[in-house]
Amino acid sequence: TLSVAGMSAGDILENLPGGIKVKAYKSTDEGVSFLVTTADGTTIYHAGDFNDWHWQDESTEREARVADELFKKILNRIASENDRINIAMFPVDVRQGSDFARGAKLFLKAIKVDDFFPMHFGGDYKEACDFSEYAESPETTFHCLHKPGETVELR
């Protein structure tokens, strides 16, 4: 039986079943983001609602600057502790208009990612899938899931 534990940014749960370790990082919105490390050292990052949440097309210059500064501060912390992440799930939210992929692009510039999964795109699979065509991260494999429950086997 596994007990449930609430986590705050900075918390680390170690020695979980199967040798799993979980670290929580701050978010720019609700909750936290998580880095899971498996017993074999594989790292899996789930951003939750961590993103560069500003709408360049709608935000004031000040709102955009504040959102960008907070995002970069948290991203720098994550990057300082993780130069490479094997699997990352990160928001690519088309509601943000022209900036819908900004946070993901900055994340991929700061941290080497082997396999990237866009999320938080509200069913707009085309936009999420198009992201991989212009992301500047040649060492990253981009995976697009086209329906809920779809799986991908990684090697």
Label every PLM stretch briefly.
Residues 2-14, 100-155:
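Binuclear metal-ion centers of metallo-dependent hydrolases, dominated by the metallo-beta-lactamase
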Residues 4-84, 149-155:
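Core dinuclear metal-dependent hydrolase active-site scaffold
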Residues 27, 95-98:
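Active-site glycine- and acidic-residue-rich loops that bind
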Residues 45-46, 86-90, 116-118:
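Structural recognition of the beta-strand scaffold that forms the well-ordered cores
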Residues 51, 91-95, 120-122:
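Catalytic metal-binding/acid-base residues of hydrolase active sites
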Residues 55, 97, 126:
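Conserved protein kinase catalytic core
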Residues 72-78, 97-106:
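A short, acidic, amphipathic alpha-helical segment used as a generic capping/interface helix at domain edges
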Residues 79-84, 89, 107-109:
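Metal-dependent phosphoesterases centered on the DNase I-like endonuclease/exonuclease/phosphatase
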